[in-house]
């Protein structure tokens, strides 16, 4: 079990601040506030409608199920925005139940009704990893979107900021407390290529999602758990797919699982075959 300064993690992300906000290298409302609804928003190519905030974070993973952090668990009604327009159409659903995944910081909640087809359901990255294998995994140095509070105050979904970071660390069995132990993926402040977008978790961000991308699709990879002085950490969902699936399937639903690295398309395979055949002909 690796304690990443457990007291600091919990107190930093759970202690209320006046106007907590995801820390960015250089914040711009146009680029980083989802509900500025600006063409410069770094997330404009993606669908953020399946993430809601009411003082804690909900991320939708099936028709009526969502994932959140156990130590900052989201319960109660959730309001989703169909677009990035703060005056746009919203969908509000009630809350039904919450189930913790073992002794981890991951919890699966259920809404009392479906938010409907206009609200995104996110697939979960299906590649597992460990501290020993992380450097050879698809995730190593992969860029990810980090969702957190915008610092505008209030327990509403419009308090929504997006930054980026590169996932460059992994720890097995991180102990937030003696009874809260989870595999975590981490990211720090040393990604100069990300410029103004580089993000670091702060108070209030616990339970928010960490997304990788595949084409124009957001792929759910982690749920924010905490920080220490040098890094941010998110609970790594892929290592708990069996447990998450069991809860969702017991309710008659299913997860969408996504490989973080796309398989070669049939057209690409055909093209490669043609190149190989051409080379063989030249040799002969």
Say what each PLM segment does:
Residues 106, 112-198, 238:
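Chymotrypsin/trypsin-fold serine protease catalytic domain
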Residues 62-63, 67-104, 114-116, 138-142, ...:
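Catalytic-histidine neighborhood of serine endopeptidases
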Residues 79-84, 147-149, 211-213:
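A generic structural motif
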Residues 56, 89-96, 159-164, 219:
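Short beta-strand segments
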Residues 21-50, 54-73, 162, 170-173, ...:
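C-terminal subregion of chymotrypsin/trypsin-like serine protease catalytic domains
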Residues 5-24, 249-270:
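Short, threonine-centered small-residue motifs that mark membrane-proximal processing/anchoring sites
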Residues 277-284:
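C-terminal membrane-anchoring or membrane-association module
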Residues 99-100, 155, 198-203:
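Short Gly/Pro-enriched turn/cap motifs at secondary-structure boundaries
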């Amino acid at each position: 079990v690796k304690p990443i300064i457990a007291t600091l993690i919990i107190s930093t992300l759970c202690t209320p601040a006046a106007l907590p906000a995801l820390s960015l290298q250089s914040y711009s409302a146009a680029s980083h506030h989802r509900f500025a609804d600006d063409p410069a928003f770094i997330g404009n190519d993606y669908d953020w409608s399946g993430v809601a905030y009411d003082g804690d974070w909900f991320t939708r993973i099936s028709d009526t199920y969502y994932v959140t952090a156990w130590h900052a668990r989201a319960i109660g009604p959730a309001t989703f925005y169909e677009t990035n327009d703060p005056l746009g159409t919203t969908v509000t659903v009630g809350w039904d139940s919450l189930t913790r995944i073992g002794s981890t910081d991951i919890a699966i909640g259920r809404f009392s009704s479906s938010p409907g087809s206009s609200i995104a359901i996110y697939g979960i990255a299906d590649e597992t990893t460990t501290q020993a294998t992380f450097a050879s995994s698809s995730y190593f140095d992969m860029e990810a979107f980090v969702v957190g509070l915008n610092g505008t105050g209030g327990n509403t979904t419009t308090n929504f900021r997006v930054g980026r970071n590169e996932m460059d660390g992994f720890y097995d069995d991180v102990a937030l407390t003696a009874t809260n132990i989870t595999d975590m993926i981490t990211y720090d402040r040393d990604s100069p290529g990300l410029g103004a977008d580089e993000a670091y978790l702060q108070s209030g961000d616990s339970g928010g999602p960490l997304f990788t991308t595949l084409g124009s699709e957001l792929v759910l990879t982690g749920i924010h758990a905490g920080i220490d002085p040098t890094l941010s950490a998110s609970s790594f969902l892929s290592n708990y797919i069996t447990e998450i699936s069991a809860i969702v399937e017991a309710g008659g639903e299913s997860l969408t699982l996504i490989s973080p690295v796309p398989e070669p398309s049939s057209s690409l395979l055909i093209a490669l075959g043609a190149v190989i055949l051409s080379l063989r002909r030249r040799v002969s």
